[in-house]
A protein has these predicted regions:
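Alpha/beta enzyme core
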Residues: 1-131, 138-148
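Extended, intrinsically disordered, low-complexity segments
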Residues: 134-176
Length: 176
């Protein structure tokens, strides 16, 4: 908080962490993670600081365990609950029915969780929707196209329509 953070996401994965939509994850004991959530909640100094508790147990231990963990983390002081990696509309709806709001979900392009519109997800009970790699994937595709063009043509000629101008970029980052 002293560094200006307004919140934190605490995950129950073991180290080294993997993307929640990848195989090969494992989770710590639920009570161990709940203790971390409780410590974060107890450390709040009265200022509004949002604690999001994420569980990856859906993939490792199934829905019942993921829901149990999420409820345990709520009891420990989490403000927002986040069950990572639902694989269907039915799983999303079940999470929305069984857990108290507010709820968070990640939509990873090409990942496990099917994409729905923001209104639909809100109706299912989700208030926070993370498109966590969409911008990265778009930027990577643009970089790949640009450097392939440079390799093939030796210049950026013909790319100006797909690029920001020098002035546009400086305006975007607030440099005069």
């Amino acid at each position: 908080r002293s560094a200006g953070a307004m919140g934190v996401v605490l995950e129950d994965q073991t180290w080294p962490k993997r993307c929640g939509h990848m195989r090969g994850k494992s989770v710590v004991e639920a009570e161990e993670h709940a203790a971390k959530v409780r410590a974060a909640a107890d450390a709040r100094d009265g200022e509004r600081f949002i604690i999001t508790a994420r569980t990856d147990a859906l993939d490792t231990d199934g829905m019942d365990e993921a829901l149990r963990r999420a409820l345990l983390y709520k009891e420990a002081g989490a403000d927002v609950l986040f069950v990572e990696g639902p694989r269907s509309r039915e799983e999303l709806e079940l999470i929305g029915r069984e857990l108290p709001p507010p709820l968070a979900v990640n939509l990873v392009d090409g990942g496990n969780t099917p994409h729905f519109g923001l209104e639909e997800l809100e109706e299912m009970g989700f208030f926070s929707v993370g498109f966590v790699v969409s911008g990265l994937y778009a930027a990577a595709a643009a970089l790949e196209r640009t450097y392939r063009h440079l390799l093939e043509h030796g210049s950026t000629g013909g790319l100006s329509e797909t690029m920001m101008s020098f002035d546009e970029f400086n305006d975007m980052i607030g440099v005069e």
